[in-house]
Structures are given as C-alpha cells and as structure tokens.
C-alpha cells in the first residue's frame, strides 16, 4: 500500500496540468478521461516529426482518437489504382472510385495529419507484362501515365481532401514471378533489362515529375518505394543504381523504402537506411531525404505468432521512432495502425474485431515514446550497424530537448536518453553518466496504457535524480526501452 501511495503522489507531481494553456478538443477513444497529457510543448516550433503510420479507409472513425493521441505527422492513407480510374484508354477518369480514399483523407486532415497516397497498377491496355496489374506501363503508354498523374495532382492540389505527397508504385523491385497482384506489390524488376528495370523506372519518373509539379507546385514526389531485399540486395541495389543512372535522383523529392524487424543486433531500418545513404552519397545526393513508408515488427507468415510476440513488438515500437529520428528520416510509417488479425503478418498496433478496436501494448509503446520524443533533436554519434557482440549490450541514443515533457522539471532544457538491450534474458545494469547532482525523470513500462484507471498499470514516470552526487543514474535495462530526461 505504501508503494502504491508513493507512486500516486509522484504521478500527481509529474502530470499536474499547466494552468493557462489549452488545446483544441480532439476526438478520442470512448471511455478515456479528458486530461492534459504529456508532452506539453511550448515555445519555438518543434523539430521535424518523422512519426506516422498506415491507416486505410475501412477502419471506422473510432480510430481517430488513437490517431490524435499519438500526434503523428504522417499517414499513408490509401492507394490510387490507375487501372480502376482509367480502365479504357481515353475514356476519361472514373474519379468516383476514389470516394472512400477521399473520405479517409478528409478525416485525417481534420485530425491534423498529413496524408500520402500510393499510385500503382497499370490498366490492361497499358501493361508491359500482359495480364499483370503490378506491371509498369509500356513505353508507348508512359505518356498516358504522365497525363493521368498531372490530372491526379491537379484534382487534389487544394481543398479539404488535398494530397501533396505521392508515392510512385509500391515495391517495384519485385519481379512478376515474385509479386502476386493481390499482394499490392509492384513488379518492374526484369533481369533482361538494364539495371533489372531500374533505369526504366527512372525514365518514367523523369517524365511524370515535371507534370506533377506543374499541376501542383506544392506536390512532393516519393520515388522508389523499394522493398530493398536483405541481406542479398544485388537486385534492389541494381534497380536503385538504374534509377539514379538516368538522373532521376533529381526527379524525386525523396527516396522511399520499406524495412521490417531486426537483422542481427540492429533493426533493418538502420541497415537499410545506412546502405541507401551510402548509395545516394556516391551519386552526389547526400541531402536527398529518405522516407521509410513501411516499418513494423511482424511475426512472419507462419501462424500462430510466438507467445511473447506482443511484448517483442512493443519493444520494437518503443525504440524504432527514436532510431528513425536519430537516422534523420523525414518520415517513418508503421504498417499498419489498425486491421483485423492477422492482417499483414500481425503487424498492426490495434486489433479491429468487427469494429471493436483493441490497442496492443505496441500501440501504447508507440504513443508514449512518440510523445516523449516530440521536440527532440538527435545529438549522439552517427548511427551504425551494430556488431554481433552488441546483441546483449546496452544501446544509448541521445537527444536534446528545448523543454522537458515533465512539469516536475519546470520545462527546462533537457537531454533525453533512450536505453535498451537488443536481446537479453535478464536486465543489464547500466550507469548513465550525468553531471553530478543532475535532476532527472525516468520513464519505464512504456507499453502500458497511460489512461488506465489504475496508476500502477500506467507507464511509470518518477524522479530519478543523482541524489548522491556521483554523476551516475543507475538503470536496469532490458528489451523494453527506458527513457530518461536529465536537466542540462
């Protein structure tokens, strides 16, 4: 009982609302109490926020409360299927097929989230690979695709359903033999073509890019959308080299790619980002922004998932956006926010059971970590692929934050540390080096619901200052990341 009372008192100190500051009312999940929750950010504009997710049209509006709760910047809001909109060449555009996508864009925009759309699937009359929706258009029909993209960008250049971010195809580095149409993959890869078809993709990109920009000067074109195979990236690398060999690096505003799960001691997001950056650097495109438009922890195609999968997924969710920020990604989208199980390899953060939405621990890990990371700038050493011997060692990411998330630290500038161990059976003791006597707040159990009526079932936030002035804050670190804010 004494521990329970102590924790409640600490929580009251840490989360007392700041008087005089209010926010516009936003939809929220039914049954959640109305309260001002961390972080409370004021002052200069926050640094770029890479956090986002995929949210499709069929999920009911109750999901919007979960969207606004995490304060994301981005969402992948659906697909534009050229094959459905122009089934007959020259027969006009059937924009009505986008009604549900438009409705999704509107509700996301009203929630303050920037939508992106994926353009894919060639009509039967335009397919380079006959009978395959994933096919690129034939050379003689690229002009039709250019006209379509110009009309599309113009249609959605303004209004309450405005879309400015366009991703061109989805995973085109798959070949037709590898990509069933029902999977939503592209299939531009062709070993008989230069650079496995990447040069052709680049030439198409060079033609549609100016048309999109002319139709909407605010448009942002995401090129690539690469699956980027790993560890054997020979085809994907050739495909990307082909894109860049045509000069199409200047016909996209950002390069997008997908990265799921871990590889060795590192997350594949780190491996792939560093590999892609090296390739871009070799082409003089050092500052080309990167978007990871699909990330997640999945349990693969085998069912059922392992018994501990939800905890493993939560561990990943609590660190992956810190890694995305440390990597300098423009965007990182979890695929997907909500769907019926198993969805895509059980990757979702929220289970949708006939309209009943049940957040997983990974959703709360996403929410709590994203809020703690709001307004941060990475100040640690450059990210690198971890060696195998780091698998059971504590990893630390360091961020600067102009204002603490916690009223207990009086909104002072802080250094935020994110600590975890990639794989470990027992917690690893780690002494975090801080200035002697530094004030600090520790955040643990980020996979818990911050709105749970029982404070013991909420994330744990408590003072963990260096009270003995030895310049160390001891932490027992395991797979679920711990966050520590230290006054500078």
In which residue ranges do the predicted regions lie?
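Bacterial N-terminal signal peptides
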Residues: 8-19
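Solvent-exposed beta-hairpin/edge-strand motifs
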Residues: 433-455
């Amino acid at each position: 009982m004494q521990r329970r009372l102590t924790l409640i008192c600490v929580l009251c100190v840490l989360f007392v609302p700041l008087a005089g500051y209010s926010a516009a009312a936003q939809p929220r999940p039914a049954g959640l109490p109305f309260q001002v929750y961390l972080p409370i950010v004021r002052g200069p504009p926050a640094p770029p926020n890479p956090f986002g997710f995929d949210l499709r049209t069929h999920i009911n509006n109750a999901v919007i409360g979960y969207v606004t709760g995490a304060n994301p910047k981005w969402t992948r809001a659906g697909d534009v299927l050229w094959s459905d909109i122009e089934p007959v060449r020259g027969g006009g555009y059937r924009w009505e097929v986008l009604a549900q996508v438009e409705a999704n864009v509107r509700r996301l925009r009203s929630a303050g989230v920037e939508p992106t759309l994926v353009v894919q699937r060639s009509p039967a009359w335009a397919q380079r690979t006959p009978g395959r929706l994933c096919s690129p258009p034939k050379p003689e029909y690229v002009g039709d695709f250019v006209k379509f993209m110009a009309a599309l960008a113009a249609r959605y250049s303004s209004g309450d359903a405005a879309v400015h971010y366009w991703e061109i195809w989805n995973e085109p580095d798959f070949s037709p033999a590898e990509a069933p149409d029902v999977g939503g993959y592209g299939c531009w890869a062709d070993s008989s073509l230069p650079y496995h078809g990447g040069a052709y993709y680049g030439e198409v990109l060079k033609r549609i890019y100016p048309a999109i920009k002319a139709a909407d000067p605010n448009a942002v074109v995401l090129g690539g959308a690469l699956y980027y195979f790993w560890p054997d990236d020979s085809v994907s690398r050739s495909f990307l080299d082909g894109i860049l060999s045509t000069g199409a690096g200047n016909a996209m505003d950002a390069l997008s790619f997908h990265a799921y799960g871990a590889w060795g001691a590192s997350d594949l997001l780190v491996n792939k980002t560093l590999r892609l950056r090296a390739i871009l650097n070799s082409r003089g495109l050092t500052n080309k922004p990167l978007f990871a438009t699909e990330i997640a922890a999945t349990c693969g195609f085998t069912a059922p998932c392992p018994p501990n999968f939800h905890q493993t997924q939560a561990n990943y969710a609590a660190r992956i956006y810190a890694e995305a920020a440390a990597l300098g990604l423009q965007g990182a989208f979890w695929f997907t926010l909500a769907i019926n199980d198993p969805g895509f390899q059980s990757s979702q953060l929220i289970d949708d059971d006939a309209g009943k939405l049940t957040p997983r621990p990974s959703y709360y890990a996403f929410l709590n970590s994203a809020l703690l990371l709001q307004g941060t700038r990475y100040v640690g050493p450059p990210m690198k692929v971890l060696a195998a011997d780091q698998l059971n060692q504590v990893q630390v990411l360091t961020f600067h934050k102009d204002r603490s998330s916690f009223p207990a630290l009086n909104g002072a500038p802080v250094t935020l540390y994110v600590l975890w161990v990639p794989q470990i059976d027992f917690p690893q003791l780690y002494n975090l080096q801080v200035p002697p006597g530094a004030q600090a707040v520790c955040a643990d159990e980020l996979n818990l619901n911050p709105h749970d009526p029982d404070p013991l079932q909420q994330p744990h936030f408590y003072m963990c200052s260096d009270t003995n002035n030895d310049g160390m804050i001891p932490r027992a670190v395991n797979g679920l990341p711990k966050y520590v804010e230290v006054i500078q």
